[in-house]
From Swiss-Prot:
Pfam family name, one: MutS_V
PANTHER family named in the record: DNA MISMATCH REPAIR PROTEIN MSH1, MITOCHONDRIAL, DNA MISMATCH REPAIR PROTEIN MUTS FAMILY MEMBER
GO cellular component: cytosol
Gene3D superfamilies xrefs: 1.10.1420.10, 6.10.140.430, DNA repair protein MutS, domain I (3.40.1170.10), MutS, connector domain (3.30.420.110), P-loop containing nucleotide triphosphate hydrolases (3.40.50.300)
Protein family: Belongs to the DNA mismatch repair MutS family.
Coiled coil start-end: none
GO molecular function per UniProt: ATP binding; ATP-dependent DNA damage sensor activity; damaged DNA binding; mismatched DNA binding
Protein task: This protein is involved in the repair of mismatches in DNA. It is possible that it carries out the mismatch recognition step. This protein has a weak ATPase activity.
Name of the protein described by the UniProt record: DNA mismatch repair protein MutS
Translocase keyword on record: no
Species of origin: Histophilus somni (strain 129Pt)
UniProt cross-references to InterPro entries, sorted A to Z: DNA_mismatch_repair_MutS (IPR005748), DNA_mismatch_repair_MutS-lik_N (IPR007695), DNA_mismatch_repair_MutS/MSH (IPR017261), DNA_mismatch_repair_MutS_C (IPR000432), DNA_mismatch_repair_MutS_clamp (IPR007861), DNA_mismatch_repair_MutS_core (IPR007696), DNA_mismatch_repair_MutS_N (IPR016151), DNA_mismatch_repair_MutS_sf (IPR036187)
Length: 856
């Protein structure tokens, strides 16, 4: 902690501002640089790979310093934000000329990973979300804000697993949490963690803040008033957003409650295994989003990814999306609309910057271009009756368009402070000041020629810099010829600089004109915001509508290009997919993809899948999940036909990985995921199980796999694909209704194997493990030895087939016995609660039947 005594006036000012912003890096404007001092300088030097120097002394100690040029700040901010750091931007707000002591400075904004709106700092095709968590006992409130669109949502989660799944879905770049949060291990993997005091989560404060933001008396109109934990989180989040932006947030105009029942639930493991927007290596190649996303606007790409991560269960909405896609294809409007939509660009984020008054001149020209496309887009939409509602959501912006066309030049400078942004003819006073300022060039050329002639100095020239203003420069070799009325202003190595009364007078006149011109231009620029902001709500609705139109047009193009079909929805539980294909694998393969059917229903709800490694079991399972998910975002699907029943959740238990950081083995991770499925799945869930029970002994693994399959088939009755190498499980269809065997085919000839990748009814005859090992390049001597050992084991197996059968019977018996014990204990507990003296004969008979039923 630095005290202010004995420091220079400038360092006192710095330390005072730093004390007000202790938890962020302070970028302190000094001339053409942003400087950092003390610990901030050391940290920035390390993170940004810039030089760490010293700035003289203050209070008797050298001051560590690092700095970046003001014109290059965006690149450095982008790097810091990506690393999860926050930065306070401290600007000079006073005039250096009239300042007594240090120029007045103040923090104008705080840039944090989750509240940035600058185009250079944002990932173009990904949402940039900030979230807040509030915990009470085992329940959580979650608030999520997209500062770049104003979308504000809350939800309430009943347990840690649900919270993890939701955080995995939204992937916040900044995460606020209460200092009272107990389960901190849930958030340790996220960057941009911010610990907040408990008082910021008070419900009464939250309600007051939200009502003030939306201009309402209560929150009933938003349907969030009963979500107490979510509101507590929202209050903290809104307060933080206001603190960092240092301005009003007019683009945040509503708040909504996200209900789990509205969406198909997908847990963190399933998102990872299905590679929706990120592959298993952490990249974006060969993901579902990479195949589906050919949107022509960044806001369309972001919306499509939201749909992928949050499939909806509202069949009416889904069928509406399907109809829109069908109409776009029938009317051949994809090629007409996409060039127009491409010109709309990222209207959503531009409007956020308009709301925050941080929009740059080129943002306004892009907004102008977007508004110019709207009449043409609406004209195309009138060709389709189904799109009337779309067209009605886009208001008439002809007044706002005319304003931007009159006010802003075609190719403005990057920043308003550079001047020359407002178009000629927009404001008469501005035009007058500019003519005075621009007349300086001609005057100075005339003066330079006149002075050369008067003095006979051919190296004489007139120049200007920000520190010394206008000057006459003469080379050192001719400086002795300077007239007596030339007053020396600056000495350089090779030249002398002078001022004369005439030039000084003109300088004051020109600087006044330039200053007045810039000041008026900034004022006019701010007035443009004043004229746009009353229409912000309509503009935001239009941008959201255009983003959705982009997604639907994109899905129509994908359906046509990739030969997708419209799936049908059924009220009957089940899936019937004819000749389904994996949407990603079919695009990556050089050879034609082998399509396969899937049939799951209430009489056929668990498929035991056997077959060789590399045979296509995992691909078959994943494609079933992806086709189902695509149907639930409203997309067409890769199949000949598809009928999809109600789905509430999609679960996967695929692949093997350990969690060394948490001290969990591969088997422990596998069992944790399996436990989650067994606790959460319902008869409307789609469950994919790939090789359960491999990480332990054979009998342990077989017992667990058997018991899990039995539970899923008999108790839960979920729609399940169950891949296994335990051939013992192929007898399950004989014992339990609803279980069926299927296998992936392969042909072996002369030690060579050909995978047919075709799904067939019945169990596989063998696993072809040695053939796959040979394909993988295992040395031939090892393969030969393995074949000999296999023959020995097969002979031994035939001799002990009775013993093997007894082991299998024992596994069944133990599981049945455990179930019988559970039933018996339930009967005993019921009997303990009965008093025979209080039962009528009829009640006693009913109890007897009930107990008999429990035992059976």
């Amino acid at each position: 902690m630095h005290t202010f005594e004995n420091h220079t006036p400038m360092m006192k000012q710095y330390l005072k501002i730093k004390a007000e912003n202790p938890d962020v890096l302070l970028f302190y404007r000094m001339g053409d640089f942003y400087e950092l001092f003390y610990d901030d300088a050391k940290k920035a030097a390390e993170l940004l790979d810039i030089s760490l120097t010293k700035r003289g002394q203050s209070a008797g100690q050298p001051v560590p310093m690092a700095g970046v040029p003001y014109h290059a700040i965006e690149g450095y901010l982008a790097k810091l934000v990506h690393l999860g750091e926050s930065v306070a931007i401290c600007e000079q707000v006073g005039e250096p000329v009239i300042a007594k002591g240090p120029v007045e400075r103040q923090v104008v904004r705080i840039v944090t990973p989750g509240t940035v709106s600058d185009e250079a700092l944002l990932p173009e095709k990904q949402d940039n979300l900030i979230a807040t968590i509030y915990q009470e006992k085992t329940q959580f409130g979650l608030a999520v804000l997209d500062m770049t669109s104003g979308c504000f949502q809350i939800s309430e989660l009943q347990d840690a697993a649900s919270l993890q799944a939701e955080l995995q879905r939204i992937q916040p770049v900044e995460l606020l949490y209460s200092e009272a949060l107990e389960d901190k291990h849930l958030i340790e993997q996220f960057k941009g963690l911010r610990r907040r005091p408990l008082w910021e989560f008070e419900l009464s404060t939250a309600i007051q803040l939200l009502n003030r933001q939306f201009g309402t008396k209560d929150l009933r109109g938003f349907g969030v008033e009963k979500a107490v934990l979510g509101l507590c989180a929202a209050g903290c989040l809104l307060q933080y957003a206001k603190e960092t932006q240092r301005t009003a947030l007019p683009h945040i105009q509503s708040i909504s409650l996200l209900q789990n029942s509205d969406t198909v639930q997908i847990d963190a493991s399933t998102r990872r295994n299905l590679e929706l927007t990120q592959n298993l290596a952490g990249g974006t190649e060969n993901t579902l989003a990479a195949i589906l996303d050919k949107c022509v606007t960044p806001m369309g790409s972001r919306l499509l990814k939201r749909w992928i991560h949050q499939p909806i269960r509202n069949i009416e909405k889904l069928q509406c999306r399907q109809q829109h896609i069908q109409m776009l294809l029938q009317q051949n409007l994809v090629e007409e609309l996409q060039p127009l939509l491409r010109q709309v660009g990222d209207m959503e984020r531009i409007l956020a910057r308009v709301a925050l008054r941080s929009a740059r001149p080129r943002d306004l020209t892009r907004l102008r271009t977007a508004l110019e496309q709207i009449p043409f887009i609406q004209h195309q939409l009138t060709k389709i009756p189904h799109f009337v509602a779309f067209s009605q959501q886009i208001a008439d912006f002809s007044v706002q368009l005319a304003l931007l066309q009159r006010a802003i030049i075609d190719n403005p400078p990057l920043l308003i402070r550079d001047g020359g942004v407002i178009a000629e003819g927009y404001n008469e006073e501005l035009d007058e000041w500019r003519s005075l300022s621009e007349g300086a060039t001609r005057y100075l050329k005339d003066l330079e020629q006149r002075e050369r002639a008067n003095t006979g100095i051919d190296t004489l020239k007139i120049g200007f810099n920000a520190v010394h203003g206008y000057y006459i420069q003469i080379s050192q070799g001719q400086a002795h010829k300077a007239p007596l009325h030339y007053v020396r202003r600056q000495t350089l190595k090779n030249a002398e600089r002078y001022i004369i009364p005439e030039l000084k007078t003109y300088e004051e006149k020109v600087l006044k004109a330039k200053g007045a011109s810039l000041a008026l231009e900034k004022q006019l620029y701010d007035e443009i915001f004043d004229q746009l902001l009353p229409h912000l709500g309509d503009l935001q609705l239009a941008s959201l509508t255009l983003a959705e139109l982009d997604v639907l047009t994109n899905l129509a193009e994908r359906a046509e290009t990739l030969n997708y079909v419209q799936p049908q929805f059924s009220t009957q539980i089940g899936l019937q997919i004819m000749q389904g294909r994996h949407p990603v694998v079919e695009q990556v393969l050089k050879d034609p993809f082998i399509a396969n059917p899937v049939e799951l229903n209430q009489k056929r709800h668990l498929l035991i899948i056997t077959g060789p490694n590399m045979g296509g079991k995992s691909t078959y399972m994943r494609q079933t999940a992806l086709i189902t998910l695509m149907a639930y975002i409203g997309s067409f699907v890769p199949a000949e036909s598809a009928v999809i029943g109600p789905i509430d959740r999609i679960f996967t238990r695929i692949g093997a990985s350990d969690d060394l950081a948490s001290g969990r083995s591969t088997f422990m991770v596998e069992m944790t995921e399996m436990a989650n499925i067994l606790h959460q799945a319902t008869e409307q869930s789609l469950v994919l199980i790939d090789e359960i029970g491999r990480g332990t002994s054979t009998y342990d693994g077989l017992s667990l796999a058997w018991a899990c399959a039995e539970q899923l088939a008999q108790k839960i009755r979920s729609l399940t694909l169950f891949a296994t190498h335990y051939f013992e499980l192929t007898v399950l269809p004989e014992k339990i209704d609803g279980i069926h065997n299927v296998h992936l085919d392969a042909i072996e000839h002369n030690d060579n194997i050909a995978f047919m990748h075709s799904i067939q009814e019945g169990a596989a005859s063998k696993s072809y493990g040695l053939a796959v090992a040979a394909l993988a390049g295992v040395p031939q001597n090892v393969i030969k030895s393995a074949k000999q050992k296999l023959k020995q084991l097969e002979t031994l197996s035939q001799q002990n087939s009775c013993q093997s059968q007894s082991v299998l019977t024992q596994v069944q018996g133990e599981l049945t016995l455990m179930e019988e014990e559970e039933n018996t204990s339930a009967v005993i507990e019921t009997l303990k609660t009965l008093d025979p003296n209080e039962l009528s004969p009829k009640q006693a008979l009913e109890c007897l039947y009930q107990l008999k039923k429990m035992l059976n």
